[in-house]
C-alpha cells in the first residue's frame, strides 16, 4: 500500500496528468507524458497523486478514448462532475512493470534523468536534468553547478548508457 510520495516513486512512474473534467458524468481529460498510445489505452489500475493536497487515489479505469492530443478517461468510482473535479490536477501513476519492454537501445526518460554523465576521459560533465525532444533525436541537458551542456543522443555522441548504474559515457565533441 502506498502511504508516502517516496513509496509511490519507488513502485510507480508518472505517465500523465488529469488536466480537466469532461461532461457531467465524471469523465476527465488526460494529458499523457508519453507518446506511446499503447500505454494509455491499456490502463487498468492506477494511482493518482495530488501534490497540493498530498492525497493519493487508487482507481480502476473503466474506459479510455482519444480526443485530439488528449485522452478522455472514465474511472469506475467517478461518476459525477463534482467527483471528477476532485481529481483534476492529479498525476497518474502506473507500475514500472506495466510499461512495455523496450529494445536495448531504447529508454524511458525516467531511466535517463538524474544519470551522471562523463566524457571518455573520465571528466564529470554533470547530471542529466532534462531531455529535449527535437524530432530527429533527443538531446540531453546536462548540468554541473551553473553550467549546462547539451549532448545529442546519437551514436556519434554517446558511447555507453548504463541505466542500472545511472551513468552515461559521452564523446567530447569539438564544436566548430
From Swiss-Prot:
An annotated GO BP: rRNA processing
Protein name (database record): Ribosome maturation factor RimM
Subcellular location: Cytoplasm
Gene3D superfamilies linked: PRC-barrel domain, RimM
Keyword Ubl conjugation: no
The entry's keywords: Chaperone, Cytoplasm, Ribosome biogenesis, rRNA processing
Binding partners and assembly: Binds ribosomal protein uS19.
Lineage: Bacteria, Thermotogati, Thermotogota, Thermotogae, Thermotogales
Domain PRC barrel per the UniProt entry, residue ranges: 104-176
Domain notes: The PRC barrel domain binds ribosomal protein uS19.
Gene Ontology cellular-component terms listed: cytoplasm; ribosome
Described purpose of this protein according to its UniProt entry: An accessory protein needed during the final step in the assembly of 30S ribosomal subunit, possibly for assembly of the head region. Essential for efficient processing of 16S rRNA. May be needed both before and after RbfA during the maturation of 16S rRNA. It has affinity for free ribosomal 30S subunits but not for 70S ribosomes.
One Gene Ontology molecular-function label: ribosome binding
Family: Belongs to the RimM family.
Amino acid at each position: 500500500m502506498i502511504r508516502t510520495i517516496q513509496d509511490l516513486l519507488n513502485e510507480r512512474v508518472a505517465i500523465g496528468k488529469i488536466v480537466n473534467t469532461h461532461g457531467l458524468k465524471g469523465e476527465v481529460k488526460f494529458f499523457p507524458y508519453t507518446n506511446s498510445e499503447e500505454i494509455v489505452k491499456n490502463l487498468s489500475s492506477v494511482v493518482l497523486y495530488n501534490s497540493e493536497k498530498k492525497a493519493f487515489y487508487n482507481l480502476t479505469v473503466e474506459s479510455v478514448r482519444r480526443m485530439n492530443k488528449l485522452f478522455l478517461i472514465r474511472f469506475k468510482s467517478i461518476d459525477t462532475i463534482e467527483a471528477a473535479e476532485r481529481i483534476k490536477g492529479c498525476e497518474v501513476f502506473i507500475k514500472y512493470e506495466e510499461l512495455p519492454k523496450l529494445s536495448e537501445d531504447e529508454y524511458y526518460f525516467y531511466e535517463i534523468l538524474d544519470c551522471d554523465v562523463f566524457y571518455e576521459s573520465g571528466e564529470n560533465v554533470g547530471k542529466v536534468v532534462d531531455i529535449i525532444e527535437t524530432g530527429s533525436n533527443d538531446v540531453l541537458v546536462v548540468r554541473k553547478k551553473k553550467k549546462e551542456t547539451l549532448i545529442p543522443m546519437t551514436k556519434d555522441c554517446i558511447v555507453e548508457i548504463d541505466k542500472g548504474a545511472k551513468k552515461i559515457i559521452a564523446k567530447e565533441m569539438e564544436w566548430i
